[in-house]
Structure formats: structure tokens, C-alpha cells
Amino acid sequence: MSEEKNSEVGGYHAKIALSLLVLVYIFNFIDRQILSILAEDIKADLGISNSDIGFLFGTAFGVFYSVVGIPMGKLADSWNRKNLISIGLAFWSLMTFLSGTAKSFLSLSIYRFGVGIGESSASPSAYSLLSDYFSPKVRATVLSIYSSGLYIGAGIGLFLGGAILDTWNSAYPDYTQAPFGLKGWQAAFMGVGLPGILLSIITFFFIKEPVRGLSEGIVTEPSKEPFKDTFKEFIGLTPISLLSEKESLKSIGINALMGFIIFVLCFALYNLTGDFLQWTAWGIGTYLVSTWIQSLSKRDVVAFMLMFKGKAAIYSFIAFPCIPFVGYAYSAFTPSFYINNHGMSALEIGTLIGLITAIGSFIGVIGGGYFGDKLRERYVGGRLYVIFAGGVLITLVGCFGMIYAESKNISLIFNFIYHIGSSVYVGCAATTVTNLVLPRMRAMAGAFFILTLSMIGLAL
């Protein structure tokens, strides 16, 4: 079967790809979210604080996920996206498994860096691949279906983590009697890491690479030197990329000024919070990204103009991350909130919160994409109306209701409402960003979009 027929818009291979990519995203968030349900045991075992857990859940993961996502996006724009997704899935699953061998805060941090690097390959590639497989008219719905894996994975991660943790700790109160001397939280990391490696083999053989730009009739030839292009994108994150410019001295001066401003900001935030690791990592990540934007303006003028000169793109990159800014913090500390305020066990939280997260968010993300596409047929800003209604109004009601409700059951109901609202924006936001750029730069734009979500939502 020819590649053209394999990549028929909305056809058989498109549906297979969408189904498998949902599974990939489920594993993406199982491996990411499981840390929150294991947090209390990890804190006790490794002797670390809430700030350290916040660093592991947010900054350690978020900075690497965000920054490495840019060259990964470039690789997805110039190489085989199916291969990149499969390799990335195998790598982050291995890093999750190795997290179960961690004996210190440092080693666990390194493995979380690895998870972030591996996962950075997934969504930019998936956004680009699915945009070629399906018509722009249903793009928000398709990307919402893909993004539902995020919430299903988060829910399953809580459930599996809690179940493995409680079962293991009950079976082996003395961990020295457990297989390989593993503790419950270590067994949980290993238990969710292995299946992802198996899934990577399936995605490699069953997802077909579509013709780039086919769904819009803007067929783009693949790059002849994809790895060289990606290496240039890596170099673009550093000031070295500015030395080859005609006005290199001026560029270096501007770059140094940006670096100084970022340093002053991070130093002030460190003095305010006392969290050296978080603001050091965030500052380095922000500096690398600002350097990349500066170098992109010289290396790829068209991409720079579409991503950073158009008002729609700028507003998108600033506004959309404000929703996960609340959401990631909410998700990271929800288990601890119910343990400390409502006396719930890890297994109870894993079951109830896991189901609430999975079901509520699935309803929100699919509904958001569907109604976004329908409203877009009638109003130019239809998808944005959906984002505001769900991502702002419903989210605020659910968040404050959960925190201030005195009854556990009422709090859980508001938690459900929160997850419906907070997931509405995902497909509509991703579609808005991918529609603003050309097919050849879709993955890179998607990577920068995810970067803004992560650097503002996760790392902050």
C-alpha cells in the first residue's frame, strides 16, 4: 500500500494512529502523575521536603521537558514522527523504571530529568502527525481525543500508584523481606515503567507515517538532513548560535542583558521563597528559551514571524498556560490535601481521585473539543469562547469549592466539577496554535506551546 493511501485523511490508518497515540499519552501521564501519590512515602524514605517534591514534580521535570522539547519539535518536523514517538516512549518508560532504584534525592532527580527528556518527544510529534491525518474541521475534536489520554493517565497513575503502594506495604511491612529489598514506592515506579517499553514496540510497527501537510493540501518534502537540523536547534538554545551572525556583538550584548534580567528576577524569587534549586533550574531554562527565540529570528524568519510577531500566537502563548498554572499545582498536592484534611488513605485517594480525574477530565476534554469545533463553524472565536467558559469560570468554581467544603463528599463533587472545567481548553488551545503556523513548523510550534504550559504551569 502506498504512503499516500496509508495516510488517507480520516481513514483506517488515521484511526489506528489516534488510538495508539491516546495510549501513549496515557502512559505519558501515568509515569508523570504517579509521583504525587507516592510523595508521602518518598518524603519519609529519602528525608526530603514538600519543596523537594514540588521540584521533582514540577521544576526537575518541567524544565527539561520544556527546553528539550524545542529541538525534539524540530526533529519531529524534519524526521519520521512515528519513530521519534516510539523511541521517546521507550526511553521515558525506562527512566520511570529506574526511578524505582533511586536511593537519594539526587538520583531520583536525574531519573525525573530523563522522564522529562523522553516525554518531550511525544506531544509535538503527535500534534503534527494527527494534524496531517485528520481534516482541520475536526482538528479540535481529534486533538481533544488524543489529549484525553492525559487525564485518563493521570487517573490511572493515581489508582495504580495507590494500589501498588498499599498492596506492597501490606505484604511486606519489613521491606528487607521484599523481593530485591524494594519499598512500596520503588515497586510502583517499576510496575508502571515496564509496560510502556512494550507499548513502544507496538507503536513502532503499527503507526504509519502520513504525508506531511496532506490534510490541507500543503505537502512538504522531508528534510534531507534531519539530525543536522536538530543539532542546529540544540545549538540555537545557547549563545554560541549568535556568534555566526553578522551583528554578533550586538546580539551577544542583547543576550547578556536578557541573562542579567533573568538572573536578577530569579535571585529575587530565591530570596522571597528560599528555594534555590527551583529558581536556578527555572532561570537556566528561561535563559535557554530566550536565547533560542533570539537565534530563531535570524535562522528561520518565517517561523519567527508566525510564532512571535502575530498577535494571535503571542496571546495564545501567554493566556493558555494560565490554566495549567493552577492545574499542575492543584494535581500535585490534591492527594496530600485529602490525606491531611479528610483522613483518606493512599488507596482510597488513588481509587476515588483517580476515577474523578479520569472521568471528569475525559468529559471535559472531549466536550471541549467537540463544542469548540461546532462553535468555530458559526463564530471565528468559537473555540476561545469554550476555553473561557470551561477553563476559567468552571475551573474557579470547582477549585474553591473543593478547598473550602467542610464535607469530604461535597469536596469530592467540586473536585469532579474542577476536572471537567480544567480540561476543556486542551484540544481547542492546541488546535489554535497548530492552525497559526505552516505544516513544516507545526511540531516546533507545538513544542513551544507545551513549553509555555510547562515553564509557567509546571516549573513555576
Residue ranges and their predicted role:
Residues 183-205, 278-285, 395:
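Symmetry-related core transmembrane helices of the 12-TM Major Facilitator Superfamily/SLC fold
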Residues 38-67:
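Extracellular/periplasmic helix-loop-helix junction of adjacent transmembrane segments
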Residues 67-106:
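Conserved MFS/SLC helix-loop-helix module at the cytosolic interface between two early adjacent transmembrane helices
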Residues 47, 80, 101-107, 118, ...:
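Helix-breaking motifs and short loop linkers at transmembrane-helix boundaries and internal kinks
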Residues 380-429:
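C-terminal transmembrane helical hairpin of 12-TM major facilitator-type secondary transporters
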Residues 78-89, 373-390:
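Cytoplasmic membrane-interface "Motif A"-like loop-to-helix N-cap segments
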Residues 56-74, 127, 355-368:
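Central cavity-lining transmembrane alpha-helices of secondary-active solute carriers
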Residues 35-36, 248-281, 311-358, 365, ...:
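Extracytoplasmic gate region of multi-pass secondary transporters
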